[in-house]
């Protein structure tokens, strides 16, 4: 039986091998040309005051400002999913370095704190709403939602009740995506054609069902760059949670997205 000293020694060796391997992979990826495509970033809440609930999903305003400024300094230009779909059809050109900012759930701070930050930088974003949460407690009101859309914010669906579509039968899932779309359009929110899968979970059957329900695109929780060859119903997305290590963590998540793309991990190519 191994004694504790040998266990520690072997554990140290194993850790060292893992570090060297990861370093070699990162070094190799960085030595190669950056892959084609662009990232889609997944946010939830931007709020100055730390919320009691969903704190892990809140990006404080100061951190978010740093992230936006970093993106602009690196030459990124925000686009909407609509812009991407139009460019895919040859109806418009994309900027040299596009990025899409998305926000799930539709918190009210998207209007009070996020919108001014975006408008000050002439940036776009897409917000995915849970239909039955609109107007409730800490979520956007109908009036705010319509105003944001008039001011250039793209609105999409996050289903009617934010339940994982993979946990229900296809008929129930169909009602979830159909009801959310109809509810917003009935309340004078312009045509809804994009969806964010709750918890990022999907199946081939769900993907096909969205197309049948006249959605044009959907985002997952799988990181990676998006190109015109990416399945529009399985767009790659990089999660940006509450930062523990400030801007350095944000840069790492962007780098990880690049590496995932170069290694071909969970890339949804048509």
Give residue ranges: language-model regions.
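Cell-envelope/glycan interface and biosynthesis
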Residues: 28-29, 111-112, 124, 129-130, ...
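Charged helix-capping and loop-helix junction motifs
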Residues: 138-145, 172-176
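Short beta-strand and adjacent tight-turn residues that come in two discontinuous sequence segments
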Residues: 128, 158, 218-220
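C-terminal active-site subregion of NodB/CE4 polysaccharide deacetylases
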Residues: 2-10, 18-101, 107-109, 167-270
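Short histidine/acidic/glycine/proline-rich micro-motifs that form metal-
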Residues: 131-135, 164, 198-201
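Residue-level marker for buried hydrophobic side chains located in beta-strands
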Residues: 101-102, 155
């Amino acid at each position: 039986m191994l004694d504790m000293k040998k266990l520690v020694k072997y554990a140290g060796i194993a850790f060292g091998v893992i570090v060297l391997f990861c370093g070699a992979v990162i070094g190799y990826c960085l030595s190669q040309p950056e892959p084609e495509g662009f990232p889609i970033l997944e946010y939830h809440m931007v709020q100055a005051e730390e919320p009691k609930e969903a704190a892990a999903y809140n990006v404080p305003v100061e951190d978010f400002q740093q992230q936006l400024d970093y993106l602009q300094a690196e030459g990124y230009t925000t686009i909407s999913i609509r812009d991407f779909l139009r460019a895919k059809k040859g109806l418009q050109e994309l900027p040299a370095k596009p990025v899409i900012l998305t926000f799930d759930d539709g918190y009210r701070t998207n209007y009070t704190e996020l919108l001014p930050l975006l408008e000050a930088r002439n940036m776009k974003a897409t917000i995915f709403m849970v239909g039955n949460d609109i107007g409730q407690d800490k979520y956007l009101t109908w009036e705010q939602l319509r105003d944001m859309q008039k001011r250039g914010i793209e609105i999409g669906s996050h289903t009617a009740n934010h339940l994982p579509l993979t946990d229900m039968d296809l008929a129930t899932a169909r009602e979830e995506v159909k009801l959310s779309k109809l509810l917003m359009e009935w309340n004078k929110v312009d045509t809804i054609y994009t969806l964010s899968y709750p918890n990022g979970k999907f199946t081939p059957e769900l993907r096909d069902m969205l197309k049948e329900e006249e959605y044009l695109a959907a985002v997952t929780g799988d990181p990676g760059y998006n190109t015109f060859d990416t399945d529009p119903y399985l767009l790659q997305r990089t999660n940006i949670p509450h930062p523990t290590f400030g801007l350095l963590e944000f840069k790492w998540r962007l780098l990880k997205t690049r590496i995932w793309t170069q290694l071909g991990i969970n890339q949804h190519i048509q």
